[in-house]
């Protein structure tokens, strides 16, 4: 059973694994609510989070303030002889709605080629003072021998190498892509192609391959869609059915969900047919029927009387309703308009394949299997599952945490946290268990994971117990238990490993983690960097001397993350 549980907990899907150390500055006063901290990535001895009064006031553009700081601190960041202007590209500049600071998002480059996983965020206050730089910079690239050579492999050959390693011929959802990066692992730094293979059959996959641009060897790979034990997807694909939106009148229907509860549904009436298409929110919500095949998105769910009480309707009822709840949570709590904050439609497909024990975000929409009736019931019946998966989409459009090792475990934990908070928002039998409503219907009290007690299902609740192997993308669904426990303690309080945490409630938990995920976390955020970002987020929201700041720090003390 334990082995089975270990396999199944990777259901809810979409880095640098290292330890860190930090010390606080006392020499110069930081701006209001900015903590003076300097935290280094211990493995590569490069800063991963620095905050305080990092520069004086300035009338320059925010990005010029950042570049001036990086040039002044070239030795600290080990940039060699290159200027900051040649070492980084500005990818986004946004206003922080809380602090009214300007947030500059950077991508490290070398010879104008992006460095995989090396992104940074800098916060420049209204008076032009630089107050935060978050994100590890890959150091000493000018000293890496392989970066002095020429690539011998082209993009096409890199894709072929990835396809050969995959070992089977998939049916692609989109054409394979390949982009050249500077890539680092524990032993080497080289040019590599990052190849993306996205497909649904013979089983869903969204693989990232790293192919050495000099030797053509596969250096690493990971899949952001995880399969679980049970029947595989039906490989007999039908031609893609029409899935066009309809025009018509907004109406209200009703239906019974997977657990038998009745829900009100926002639908569209067009030509005497009702559709599960909700036009009333900032993002249109569509629910489709795969009809037990594997083509996406399927056909827009249609009904003759706007009453969805048939057994087959249940999965669609919950997918449609819970997508709306998740949208409302993020809109009402954070004024976020869909996962991309630009009104992107929310698409869900139910009845995917036959007896399929999985749910996943494929990069553009949600997909739900029906389960086999023993391990799972239809997976759209779990509100925390839907909140979890749509939060992966949000993370992809903000911090874009790499789905490996500590950054991947943080990615998973954020989805667990907000899946739970969405459940509390809707007040539909909320708890701190993940997947309890749809997992093992014949076993009461069972779940995929527990945030209150990760060890209940074999997950670590302290950094000293973390998984250090390479399975499950470096333990993304296992080590998430460490962050989950910290989040649970932050919301509810408690004593863990002799450390007492004062709880601040779920609402403040959500505000702090949302702010950190959107404005402080970078692609390769470690647990230690996450702690620093969350503490600073709490200081921004509640003040540097607040109980919230103290509790965030204590919650990480309790799980052994410094």
Curated annotation (Swiss-Prot):
Query: Where along this sequence does the record place binding of Ca(2+) 3?
Result: 423, 429, 431, 436
Q: Which InterPro entries match?
A: FTP_domain (IPR011096), PepSY (IPR025711), Peptidase_M4 (IPR023612), Peptidase_M4/M1_CTD_sf (IPR027268), Peptidase_M4_C_domain (IPR001570), Peptidase_M4_domain (IPR013856), Zinc_Metalloprotease_M4 (IPR050728)
Q: Where does Zn(2+) bind?
A: 388, 392, 412
Q: Name one GO cellular component term.
A: extracellular region
- Cofactors, names only: Ca(2+); Zn(2+)
Give the record's keywords alphabetically: Calcium, Hydrolase, Metal-binding, Metalloprotease, Protease, Secreted, Signal, Zinc, Zymogen
Is Signal tagged as a keyword?
Answer: yes
Catalytically driven reaction(s):
Similar, but not identical, to that of thermolysin
For the protein in the UniProt heading, the enzyme class is hydrolase
Function of this protein? Extracellular zinc metalloprotease.
Assigned protein family: Belongs to the peptidase M4 family.
Q: What is this protein called?
A: Bacillolysin
Organism in which the protein naturally occurs: Priestia megaterium (strain ATCC 14581 / DSM 32 / CCUG 1817 / JCM 2506 / NBRC 15308 / NCIMB 9376 / NCTC 10342 / NRRL B-14308 / VKM B-512 / Ford 19) (Bacillus megaterium)
């Amino acid at each position: 059973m334990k082995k089975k549980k270990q396999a199944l907990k990777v259901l809810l899907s979409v880095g640098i694994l290292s330890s860190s150390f930090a010390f606080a500055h006392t020499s110069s006063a930081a701006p209001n609510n900015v903590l003076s901290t300097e935290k280094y990535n211990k493995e590569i001895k490069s800063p991963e989070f620095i905050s305080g009064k990092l520069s004086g006031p300035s009338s320059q553009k925010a990005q010029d303030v950042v570049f001036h700081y990086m040039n002044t601190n070239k030795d600290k960041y080990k940039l060699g002889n290159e200027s900051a202007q040649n070492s980084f590209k500005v990818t986004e500049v946004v206003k922080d709605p809380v602090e009214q600071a300007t947030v500059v998002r950077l991508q490290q480059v070398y010879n104008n080629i992006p460095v995989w996983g090396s992104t940074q965020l800098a916060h420049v206050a209204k008076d032009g003072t630089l107050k935060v730089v978050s994100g590890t910079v890959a150091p000493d690239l000018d000293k890496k021998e392989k970066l002095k050579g020429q690539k011998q492999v082209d993009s096409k050959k890199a894709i072929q190498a990835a396809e050969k390693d995959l070992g089977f011929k998939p049916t692609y959802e989109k054409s394979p892509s390949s982009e050249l990066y500077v890539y680092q692992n524990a032993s080497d730094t080289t040019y590599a192609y990052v190849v993306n293979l996205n497909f649904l059959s013979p089983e869903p996959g969204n693989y990232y391959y790293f192919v050495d641009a000099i030797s053509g060897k596969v250096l690493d790979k990971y899949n952001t869609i995880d399969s679980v034990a049970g029947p595989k997807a039906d490989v007999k694909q039908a031609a893609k059915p029409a899935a066009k939106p309809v025009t018509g009148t907004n109406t209200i229907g009703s239906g019974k969900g997977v657990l038998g509860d009745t829900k009100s549904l926002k639908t569209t009436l067009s030509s005497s047919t009702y559709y599960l298409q909700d036009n009333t929110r900032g993002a249109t919500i569509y629910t489709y029927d795969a009809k037990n095949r594997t083509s996406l998105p399927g056909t827009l769910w249609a009904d003759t009387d706007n009453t969805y009480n048939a057994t087959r309707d249940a999965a669609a009822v919950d997918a449609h309703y819970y997508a709306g709840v998740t949208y409302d949570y993020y809109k009402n709590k954070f004024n976020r308009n869909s996962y991309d904050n630009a009104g992107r439609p929310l698409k869900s497909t139910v009845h995917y394949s036959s007896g399929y024990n999985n749910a996943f975000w494929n990069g553009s929409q949600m997909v739900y299997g029906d389960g086999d009736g023993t391990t799972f019931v239809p997976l759209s019946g779990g509100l925390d599952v839907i909140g979890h998966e749509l939060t992966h989409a949000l993370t992809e459009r903000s911090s874009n945490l790499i789905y490996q090792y500590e950054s991947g475990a943080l990615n998973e934990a954020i989805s667990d946290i907000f899946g739970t908070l969405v459940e509390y928002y809707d007040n539909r039998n909320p708890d701190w268990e993940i997947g309890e409503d749809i997992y093992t219907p014949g076993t009461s009290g069972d779940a995929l994971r527990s945030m209150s007690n990760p060890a209940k299902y074999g997950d670590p609740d302290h950094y000293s117990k973390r998984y250090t192997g390479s399975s499950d993308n470096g333990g993304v669904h296992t080590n998430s238990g460490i962050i989950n426990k910290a989040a649970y303690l932050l919301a509810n309080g408690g004593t863990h490993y002799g450390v007492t945490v004062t709880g601040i409630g779920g609402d403040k938990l959500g505000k702090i983690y949302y702010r950190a995920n959107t404005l402080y976390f970078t692609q390769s955020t470690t647990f230690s960097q996450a702690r620093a970002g969350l503490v600073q987020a709490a200081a921004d929201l509640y003040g540097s001397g607040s109980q919230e700041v103290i509790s965030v720090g204590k919650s990480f003390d309790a799980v052994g993350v410094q």
